[in-house]
Amino acid sequence: LAASDYVIASHKVLIKLSELAIGIGPFLIEQLIRRKIGVSALSSLAYNPKKWKSSDWCLENGLINDVVDNEKKLNLTLNEFTGEVINYQLESLTMLKKVLWSDKKIDNVILENAEISARLLIMPKTQKILNKIK
């Protein structure tokens, strides 16, 4: 969701970041989530790895842009949205995407965070937790 430009979702959507519960953290996706919802909402997700957040929470915090009641409305809303977007100037859409994703530091931080995740993944305590999940 955090890597999407625009999200239309069902009211049934539930999300959580469970990484902390398995001995690592959401380091690989942290920058994308922070960019989308900010530090406070990211902290709420990351420090509560067993707690599901509702579609209302996602909407209030900017993770999704529109919530619909049922699958029929979801399909209708998606068709309407894509029907509009497809008629926009391609160059304008391309430049908009470029501007929205212009934060160059994200790539570097994601690489650094990948190293953190790798170190944590090989720790005995993390391995023990992961083996229990298997």
Give a label for each model feature.
Residues 2-89:
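Crotonase-fold acyl-CoA enzyme core
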Residues 49-56, 72, 76, 80-134:
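C-terminal alpha-helix plus adjacent terminal tail
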